UniProtKB/Swiss-Prot annotation:
Superkingdom of the source species: Bacteria
Residues flagged as site, Important for bifunctional activity: G116, F117
Name listed for the protein in its UniProt record: dCTP deaminase, dUMP-forming
GO biological processes: dUMP biosynthetic process; dUTP biosynthetic process; nucleobase-containing small molecule interconversion
Ribonucleoprotein among keywords: no
Catalysed conversion reaction: dCTP + 2 H2O = dUMP + NH4(+) + diphosphate
Amino acid sequence: MLLSDRDIRAEITAGRVRLDPYDEGLIQPSSVDLRLDRAFRVFQNHRYSHIDPAVEQEDLTELVAPEGDEPFVLHPGEFVLGSTLEVVTLPEDLAGRLEGKSSLGRLGLLTHSTAGFIDPGFSGHVTLELSNVATLPIKLWPGMKIGQLCLFRLSTPAEHPYGSAIYGSRYQGQRGPTPSRAYRDFTRAAVPEIPNGSHGA
């Protein structure tokens, strides 16, 4: 069940959902707007010939932050990691979904590639996967609205919420834009080879 504005306010007032810093004026009819922090992780393309999720590539990205009140300029075709200004904390019976802002999407800014889901029990900054699919550079201003958080109530509280030891929870408590930790539990299923002569239709 998607929570309405009154449900979101009630959950925040009760302390079950925490947004820090919190501005009540950011609540929408069925979501709450989240804002952009000032730090970004930029990919260092010259350091590796390829990206491999199976191994740690410690210096694949570099943390950068514009000085003062300057914007970060995202160029056409560029992909960087950013993060929300807000630290988001969810209880065991609520999951979140981060959606982009329509007004920014119409300018060619994608807020996330695939990772818009937020597990019950999560606490931390939400890492953003920012892409510019427009033909002109886009200025990203610190503190601007960058996305909207929708909240969904589970049928029952999660038996093992995010942060439980059973799941590892690689991003619990993350601060700022956090690079991929896929290598920590990278697994592969056995995939049978295709017999000779069976390639193609």
